[in-house]
Amino acid sequence: GIVEELAKQYGIEYGYTEVYPTMENAQLAAGCDAVSVTPCDMSAPMLQRFHDLGVKAICCRSIGYDHIDLEKARELGMKISNADYPPEGVANFAIMLMLMSLRNAGHILKRGEVQDYSLKGKLGRDISHCTVGVIGTGRIGQTVLKHLSGFGCRLLAYDLYQSEEVKKIAEYVPLDTLFAE
């Protein structure tokens, strides 16, 4: 695969495991300069354990990195990186999944594979008649809300830190209200 090609091209040794890092299996990183993770426990004790094993960097394969104790990483001199995605791409993908779900696209595609073009179970809903809630109004959440605003649906938002820009197109509500509606 691509990882093997890049490792060979750049003279990098790597190991791989499907298990999430824990205090019990952290020794798998012994001798490694960096550990690449998806969002999982990267609390102070976990970072200390990796540091004690010689790990110098944590590379997070997600946009968010709030699961990493950045203060502890700084204290240990560990480098932290995360993946960067264009908010538009992620937002559009999320909206596509919403639309496909509302229109029963999965069912329609499966029925089409067997030449069933009847309407049974294929009628969906129109998003313009829906209330859509977005949890988290950072760059991606704001982009989702901006793009959805053109569909005419009612928009609700929840975030601990409210954005004045979001207030122009969505209503901030408590999390319980967002789930209920």
Please annotate each region the language model reported.
Residues G1-C32:
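N-terminal glycine-/charge-rich "phosphate-binding" loop or analogous flexible N-terminal tail
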Residues E4-L6, A26-A30, I68-E75, L148, ...:
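Short loop/helix-cap segments at secondary-structure boundaries that form the rim of catalytic
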Residues Y14, A57, K79-I80, L155, ...:
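Hydrophobic beta-strand scaffold residues
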Residues G15-E24, A34-M46, A170-D176:
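Glycine-rich, highly charged phosphate/nucleotide-binding loops
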Residues Q27-L28, R49, T177-E181:
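Structural alpha-helical scaffold elements that stabilize or flank donor/cofactor-binding regions
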Residues G31, V55, S128-T131:
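Phosphate-coordination loops involved in phosphoryl transfer and adenosine-cofactor binding
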Residues D33-L109:
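Phosphate/diphosphate ligand-binding glycine-rich loop within oxidoreductases
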Residues K120-E181:
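Rossmann-like dinucleotide/phosphate-binding beta-alpha-beta segment
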